[in-house]
């Protein structure tokens, strides 16, 4: 029996009926069995690919991508995933569409969705705006489908919003499952989700938030470390605490990278912008103050530069379990 057939039989045992016609906004919206189903399907697709078997389930159709922030890895991952399943990819560049002339989200959403099976959206730079935009877009499609404008309603995959980055975090999680020989072996493992200096730009909060929101669901000991002022959304921290309590793991915050790395099985250094600055950026965005946003960006880079000692070095890695922690980014 092939691995794919074994995985398919396992899939039949899971309670996943509610996934049909659902969207993927945040990992904490999904049940444990729904997350398990996603991992199972991913492993089946991987097995088929490795054995040079076709993974096409569509003869035609579109995967629409909308990147309202720059992307390399996620852009190519989404395009590769669509191609793997038999979908053509069409990327909507808002600056080259009628959106630039004032067309509404409601109009655009229905127009681009006529032949679409899936829509991936990234909107991550402004606190309180990214998830809202994705919801507004999909609410317009609900209306279009209800009114007979669309013959089918495509599903949404969040390619990173202001709250979560579920595709990256799920891929990270599956990698850890493989590295440690099964999801059951992750229980009790310490993962350090730490801020790290970057000279580039004020990055979104959604990666650290997605990590603590997902990895606490598997009984792991999750430690978040960052300089003062670089907090994440308190509501996501509450989710992490509840997850840890429910699964026998733990969640805590520390003030130094050294404490987070001490005895860690996995380390995840990643830069993100200060929470207060992200809120200020959103206010400037609402005013259409691009000059203010540019000035804030310079301020953020200067603030980041005050914490250049927050870096993953060989000496820092020696603090981890046997000096051999799994490094992720």
List each language-model region with its residue ranges.
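Positively charged, low-complexity intrinsically disordered leader regions
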Residues: 2-76, 80
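Phosphate/diphosphate ligand-binding glycine-rich loop within oxidoreductases
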Residues: 56-177
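Phosphate-coordination loops involved in phosphoryl transfer and adenosine-cofactor binding
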Residues: 57-63, 187-189, 324
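Glycine-rich phosphate/diphosphate-binding loop of Rossmann-like nucleotide-binding domains
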Residues: 68-80, 177-291
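Charged helix-capping and loop-helix junction motifs
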Residues: 103-107, 205-210, 284, 309-312
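A short helix->loop->beta-strand "cap" motif at the edges of active sites that frequently abuts
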Residues: 147-154, 220, 319-328
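Glycine-rich phosphate/nucleotide-binding loop
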Residues: 270-328
């Amino acid at each position: 029996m092939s691995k794919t057939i074994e995985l398919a039989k396992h899939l039949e045992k899971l309670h996943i009926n509610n996934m049909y016609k659902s969207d993927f906004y945040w990992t904490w919206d999904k049940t444990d069995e729904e997350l398990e189903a996603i991992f199972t399907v991913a492993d089946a697709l991987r097995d088929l690919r490795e054995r040079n078997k076709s993974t096409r389930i569509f003869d035609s159709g579109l995967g629409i991508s909308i990147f309202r922030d720059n992307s390399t890895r996620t852009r190519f991952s989404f395009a590769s995933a669509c191609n793997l399943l038999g979908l053509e990819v069409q990327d909507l560049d808002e600056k080259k569409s009628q959106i630039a002339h004032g067309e509404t989200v409601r109009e655009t959403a229905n127009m681009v969705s006529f032949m679409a099976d899936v829509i991936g959206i990234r909107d991550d730079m402004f606190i309180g705006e990214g998830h809202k935009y994705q919801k507004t877009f999909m609410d317009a499609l609900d209306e279009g489908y209800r009114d007979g404008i669309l013959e089918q309603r495509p599903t949404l995959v969040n390619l990173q919003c202001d709250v979560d980055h579920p595709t990256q975090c799920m891929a990270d999680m599956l990698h850890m499952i493989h590295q440690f020989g099964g999801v059951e072996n992750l229980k009790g493992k310490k993962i350090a989700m730490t801020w790290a200096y970057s000279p580039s730009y004020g990055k979104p909060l959604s990666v650290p938030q997605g990590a603590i929101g997902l990895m606490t669901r598997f009984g792991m000991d999750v430690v978040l470390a960052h300089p003062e002022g670089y907090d994440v959304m308190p509501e996501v921290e509450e989710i992490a605490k509840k997850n840890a309590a429910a699964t026998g793991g733990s969640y805590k915050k520390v003030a130094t990278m050294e404490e987070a790395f001490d005895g860690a099985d996995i380390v995840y250094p990643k830069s993100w912008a200060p929470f207060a600055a992200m809120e200020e950026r959103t206010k400037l965005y609402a005013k259409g103050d691009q000059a203010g946003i540019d000035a804030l960006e310079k301020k953020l880079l200067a603030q980041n530069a005050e914490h250049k000692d927050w870096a993953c070095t060989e000496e820092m890695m020696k603090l981890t379990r046997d000096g051999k922690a799994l490094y992720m980014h």
